[in-house]
């Protein structure tokens, strides 16, 4: 970043999460990411610089090793003119969702992260003059807990995402329960993956956003957002997926375009184009491979059919590697929490050891190597407890990451394009796949995760599961005196 050339009018609001806000440059394929804080919890410039540097180091030394260097973009910490930051903050304030305005942009330190704009193809430094589509998916946790430490039997049958949906709707976070289940997407079975992606398109919540030429065209900020319009989305997608049957408008065209999008995303997600060391973890999938709450599974069950369990993900694909990192959570939060308390007790007695234990960094090769210890035999030491706590933090990071898929039609006769290509009904599409939202989850959030887990399971058990039991019981009573009649065929 060249200080003398910073003009807030060249930047626009791009989006924000719970802890940071992103602005994008109009011409260059870069974004700036600023930290956010509650008004009463400001940080010093030194603390903010260290926080941002930790994010960069964790991406570079841990997640890039696990997921592959082509997928992970670490960026760099930059220092910006304070006047530019203040003017930029004023410029974008009106574009921020009301639900995100409880935290303020850091305008005092001047530090930010400069990263590539992942809504663009990751080859050129400047915006290309051809249409570029980007699909952002937050897939969430792709497995059901298999730990013996789980006390709620329901957690061995229903995934966390599906249970959490009911609590989120009850508390007004979202208006409607999504039919999406992460286990369907991670199954590797194309039928289940198609259903999962269609469900995300129908009820995006904060798990799916679509950009066209860097501009958001489809997504949901919160419960106040307007209902998703698939017809309008299909209109945007025509330059990429004009249906091969020639239909130019109407419901059939919309269905054809959406179907084409789903098929292309599935093929990209199953593609293997990069190496990473997550395969070295060799964490075999244990426990249930089908979530009982998945509408896809329920529908087949009502038809008397079995859910196609698991075709298996190709080992080199990003979903497989992401799932491997997620499965570093071998104990579930229930089994992990007593180990967290062991570490806490040790730190209360020896607070000066916090730095030695690398709880706040540095996130270097030493930190990474300790994550590879997959033993689950508790020897009662602080070292064992700490390893499991750090693995849990990394696993939670992978459970909350986002996958960015950028697509662009190949130019006629272009042979120099080195990016992977996937066919569609209209043309070949060059694509790039990236991962973002890879900040290591804070050590301090573990007690919150423990309480939230209990709240989610308790609500689901008392409402949804209890209701299902009542329905099953009623059905049984209705058919207690039935007679089975056999007809000769």
Curated annotation (Swiss-Prot):
EC main group? transferase
The Swiss-Prot or TrEMBL note on domains reads:
The EXKPK motif is conserved in inositol-pentakisphosphate 2-kinases of both family 1 and 2.
| Gene3D superfamilies referenced in this protein's UniProt entry, alphabetically | Inositol-pentakisphosphate 2-kinase, N-lobe
Stated name of the protein = Inositol-pentakisphosphate 2-kinase
| Role according to the record | Phosphorylates Ins(1,3,4,5,6)P5 at position 2 to form Ins(1,2,3,4,5,6)P6 (InsP6 or phytate). InsP6 is involved in many processes such as mRNA export, non-homologous end-joining, endocytosis, ion channel regulation. It also protects cells from TNF-alpha-induced apoptosis.
> Entry's InterPro entries?
Ins_P5_2-kin (IPR009286), IP5_2-K_N_lobe (IPR043001)
GO molecular function terms noted in the UniProt entry: ATP binding; inositol-1,3,4,5,6-pentakisphosphate 2-kinase activity; molecular adaptor activity
Motif EXKPK motif per UniProt: ranges: 136-140
Q: Which GO terms describe its biological process?
A: inositol phosphate biosynthetic process; positive regulation of transcription of nucleolar large rRNA by RNA polymerase I
Kindly give the Pfam families that the UniProt entry links to this protein. Ins_P5_2-kin
List, alphabetically, the GO terms of the cellular component aspect. cytoplasm; nucleolus; nucleus
Q: What is its main location?
A: cytoplasm
What is the originating organism of this protein? Rattus norvegicus (Rat)
**Can you tell me where the transmembrane regions are?**
none
Q: Does the keyword Kinase apply?
A: yes
Compartments, as annotated in UniProt: Cytoplasm; Nucleus
Reaction(s) the record says it catalyses: 1D-myo-inositol 1,3,4,5,6-pentakisphosphate + ATP = 1D-myo-inositol hexakisphosphate + ADP + H(+)
Entry EC number(s) = 2.7.1.158
Of which family is this protein a member? Answer: Belongs to the IPK1 type 2 family.
Instruction: Write out the entry's keywords from A to Z.
Output: ATP-binding, Cytoplasm, Kinase, Nucleotide-binding, Nucleus, Transferase
């Amino acid at each position: 970043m060249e200080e003398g050339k910073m003009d807030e009018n060249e930047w626009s609001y791009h989006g924000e999460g719970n802890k940071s806000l992103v602005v994008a440059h109009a011409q260059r394929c870069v974004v700036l990411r600023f930290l956010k804080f509650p008004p009463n919890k400001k940080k010093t410039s030194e603390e903010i610089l260290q926080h941002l540097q930790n994010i960069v180091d964790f991406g570079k030394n841990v997640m890039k090793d696990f997921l592959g260097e082509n997928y992970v973009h670490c960026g760099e910490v930059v220092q910006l003119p304070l006047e530019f930051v203040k003017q930029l903050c004023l410029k974008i304030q009106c574009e921020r969702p009301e639900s995100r305005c409880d935290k303020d942009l850091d305008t005092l330190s001047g530090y930010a992260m400069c990263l590539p704009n992942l809504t663009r193809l990751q080859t050129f430094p400047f915006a290309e003059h051809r249409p570029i589509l980007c699909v952002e998916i937050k897939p969430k946790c792709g497995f059901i807990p298999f730990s013996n430490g789980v006390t709620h039997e329901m957690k061995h049958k229903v995934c966390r995402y599906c249970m959490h949906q009911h609590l989120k709707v009850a508390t007004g976070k979202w208006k409607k329960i999504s039919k999406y289940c992460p286990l369907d997407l991670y199954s590797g079975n194309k039928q289940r993956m198609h259903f999962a992606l269609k469900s995300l398109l129908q009820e995006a919540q904060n798990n799916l956003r679509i950009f066209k030429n860097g501009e958001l065209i489809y997504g949901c900020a919160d419960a106040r957002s307007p209902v998703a319009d698939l017809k309008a989305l299909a209109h945007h997608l025509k330059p990429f997926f004009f249906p091969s049957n020639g239909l130019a408008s109407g419901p059939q065209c919309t269905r054809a375009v959406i179907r084409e999008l789903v098929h292309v995303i599935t093929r990209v997600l199953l593609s293997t184009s990069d190496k990473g060391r997550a395969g070295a973890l060799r964490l075999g999938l244990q426990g249930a491979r089908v979530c009982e709450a998945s509408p896809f599974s329920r529908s087949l069950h009502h038809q008397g059919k079995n859910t196609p369990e698991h075709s298996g993900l190709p080992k080199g694909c990003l979903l497989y590697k992401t799932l491997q990192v997620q499965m570093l959570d071998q104990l579930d939060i229930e089994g992990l929490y007593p180990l967290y308390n062991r570490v806490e007790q040790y730190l209360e007695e020896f607070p000066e050891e916090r730095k030695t234990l690398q709880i706040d960094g540095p996130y270097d090769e030493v930190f990474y190597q300790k994550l590879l210890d997959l033993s689950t035999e508790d020897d009662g030491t602080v070292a064992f407890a700490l390893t499991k706590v750090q693995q849990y933090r990394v696993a939670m990071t992978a459970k909350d990451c986002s996958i960015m898929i950028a697509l662009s039609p190949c130019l006629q006769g272009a042979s120099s394009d080195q990016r992977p290509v996937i066919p569609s009904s209209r043309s070949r599409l060059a694509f790039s796949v990236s991962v973002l939202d890879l900040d290591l989850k804070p050590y301090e959030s573990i007690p919150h995760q423990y309480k939230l887990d209990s709240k989610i399971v308790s609500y689901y058990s008392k409402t949804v599961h209890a209701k299902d039991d009542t329905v099953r019981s009623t059905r049984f009573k209705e058919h207690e005196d039935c007679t089975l009649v056999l007809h000769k065929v």
